Every structure is written in C-alpha cells, then in structure tokens.
Amino acid sequence: MKNCSKYTATQKGRQGVFEAITPEDVATLIYTSGTSGAPKGVMLTHRNLLHQINNMWEIVPAVPGDRFLSMLPPWHAYERSAEYFILTHGTQQIYSSVKYLKADLQKYQPHYVFSVPLVYETLYSSIQRQISSSSPARKTVALALIKISLLYMEAKKIFEGTVLSKNPVKPSSISYMFNCLWARIVAALLWPLHNLANMLVYKKIHSTIGISKAAISGGGSLPMHVDKFFEAIGIKVQNGYGLTETSPAVAARRPFCNVLGTVGHPIKHTEIKIVDIETGEVLPDGSKGIVKIKGPPVMKGYYKNPSATNNALDQEGWFNTGDIGWIAPHHATGPSRKCGGILVLEGRAKDTIVLATGENVEPAELEEIASRSSLIDQIMVIGQDRRRLGAIVVPNNNEALAAAKRKSSLDGNNDEAKDTVMNLLYDELRTWMAGCSFQIGPILVVEEPFTIDNGLMTPTMKIRRDRVAAKYQSEIEALYE
C-alpha cells in the first residue's frame, strides 16, 4: 500500500506538470542561420509546431509505409517540422547526406524527398552530365525528347489553368478559347513523343533516383530551369516557403496545383500580405513588395531580445519576413484561373544592392541566371555603393579548363590557362545576362567553394553574404580600383 500511495502521488505530480503546459508555452529554441547577420534564438511554441503537423497532409498526402529521405541537420526548423510530420503519419525516414545521396536514392527508392533547392540543382546537373557523357546519337535523341516534353508541359498548363500571370486583367473569353484549343492540339500532337521519352529516357532516371510521389523543396527559391526540367521528366517538385520564425512552412505548392516559379498557396489558417517597402501600405495582387505573415505558425518572439522581436513583429502580429514577393491575381477563367492567391518570391529586401547611381538591384535574380552556366559552380553578386556590379565566382574547374583547352592549346595550370578561363567566364556572364537590365562588370575568381564547413553557407545552403564579403574585402577593394 505504501508503494502504491507513492506511485499515485508521483502520478498526480506528473499530471500537474502536464496541465501546466499550454499551447502558448515555448516548445523549442531554434537559432536562425544568420545569412546576413548574427543568429537569434527563435521561440517556437507547441501551437506553432502542432499547426505544421496538422496542416501539412494537404501538401504531402503520405500514407503509412511511405519512405521519406532527408538530409538536413535535425536541429534545422525545416527538418524538425518534417520529422514531426513523418513520425506522426506512420511513415519511414531515411537520413542521407550530399556524399551518399546518389547511392541512397537508388538503394531506398524513396517516395518523397525533403531537401533544399541546391540538392535538386545537384541532381539536375548530375542527370545532365550523364546525358552529355552518352554517345552522340543518344545524347541528341535525349535532348530533343526533353525539349519536346518541355513544350508538351507548357501546352498542358494553358488548358489546365496553371500559367502564372502578374496581370490583374483577365484575358478575353475568345482569346482564351482560341489559346486553349490550340494548346490542346499541340499537347495531343506532342503526347506520343513525350510518351516515347518516358520509355526511352525518363524511366531510367526514375529507376535511379526514385522519388515516385514528390520532392519537397524548401529553404530557398528553385531555379526555373530546374523546376521545368523535373516536371518535364515526370518528377513532381513541390516548392514551399518558410522561415525559422514561422515554424517554418507558411506556403507550399499542392500536388493538384503545382504552379512552376512559385511557392504555392498559403498553409491553412495562415495570412499573407504584400506591403510597400517604404510606406508599409498593403499592395494589390500582382504588385511587388515586402512579404508579411500572420497566423498560427508565427513565432512567439526572439529569446531575450525584445528589440529584435519588436522590429520583426508589429502590434497586430504581422511578421516582417524581409523577403520581396507578390501574390498572383485571381482570374475566374483563363490560363491562370488556378493561380489566384499564389505567392511568388523575388529575393531578399536586405540583400538588395544599392548602386552609387541610386539604382536598386536584386542580386538573387542575377545569380540564378548566371548559375545556369556550366562553367560557374557558385556566384555572389556584389556592388553596394559602387558605380557598377561585380561578382565573386567559384568556377567549375573541370568544365572551365576543358572549355579553355578546346579554345587553345593549354597545359591546364599555367597563367595562360587562367587568363583564358577568366575570359571565358566574362563571355559566359555576358551571354547569359544579355537580356538583363544590369550587367556584371569586374569578377573575382576564387578557388575555395562556399560551404557549410567553412562558414560561407548556412545549413540550408544559402550564401552568407556578409561573411563572403568580409573574407574577400581587400580583393573586392582591389577589384574596383
């Protein structure tokens, strides 16, 4: 009886502790990655985390037994949220890393992958290299079929209503009917060739990497050429958006409405608005401004940092993300009828470069375009308070030297080779950025890549601009002399 009384008392004490914990209590502290400043402790509550678990199934309709592969550190907000979702839905989780990703994809054949855009860019590059290394005939056929599949997908989007548009004025009914009819004809004509591509090319890719249901991308913007490629070969990539301060997910593309170039519709019970950068006034759909978030996923505040909390959260509970974006206008009919309310991101407000001329430049847009070059592994655009833009470039040495050797007789490591590579990089930037409003002038070529280990990238593989700029400060100064 004595032991029983002791056990009962202990149980009552535990029950008291359980009852004392409320949904608004802090469940965890997660520190921001500090892309452009010092890390801050984000206080996430039980309500924040439960909102993610309860509302992610609409985006990831997993069933018991599904296999998930992820490779982010478990203390990262994106990975933490994904783990909670996986563990509460009876599914399997496979942990991998960049080093073992290719082998693990083939071995475990996951239904879903949770990762960041850079991983999908790496997969894209790997597939492209495999195609390029095949025989000339196979390479020509594969590239031709991929182009046909891209055209097929573009035609489908017109009559499916998933063509992204910034224009608030809907197209005329007659114009849409004509375009829709033409798109259906084009899709019907291209379907046999697209189906042939599935059998000859895409089936082999699928058997190598799995991802039979969807790849969930978060932590950054997905380059459009990567987005289009995976859709063309039949691998659904659902891009989402969130921050550590928002638990993290606030928007994501749905399986039934996967509009390329966007981060999808808001998660349930989450509000998103776009405000003017200077005045703070709410902007109409289609207008670009600062993205603000309100709702259950928004953090309680920064740990022991009321000043930072007040800067990020206003009195009405709106969180200033610091991101620039716009919301797609609603169209009842037409090729964009399913896009209304979708969020589109266009860079970071605090990453904006202000030139000495007073012009504002979004570096992320230029970096995304420049990184399409096979000669460039990484690039960071610079130019704050300068007369013109510049860039720090980490070249793809194998591709760059191969291109240099094709251009002239080089031994690969002499000064002539370096000069030739430099000239090739300038040519590449001019070619890829020919249609841009801003051009990149001087470039600094560095051999050391930006990585998590050397502190030049965050765990979600975003470049830490402040650290890169500090590391190469003297070289940047010399670049502009």
Feature roles, as predicted:
Residues 298, 334-371, 399-419, 436-440, ...:
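Adenylate-forming
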Residues 27-53:
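Conserved AMP-binding A3 loop
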Residues 50-67, 74-178, 182-203, 236:
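Conserved AMP-binding/adenylation subdomain of ANL enzymes
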Residues 324, 372-399, 429:
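C-terminal boundary motif of the adenylate-forming
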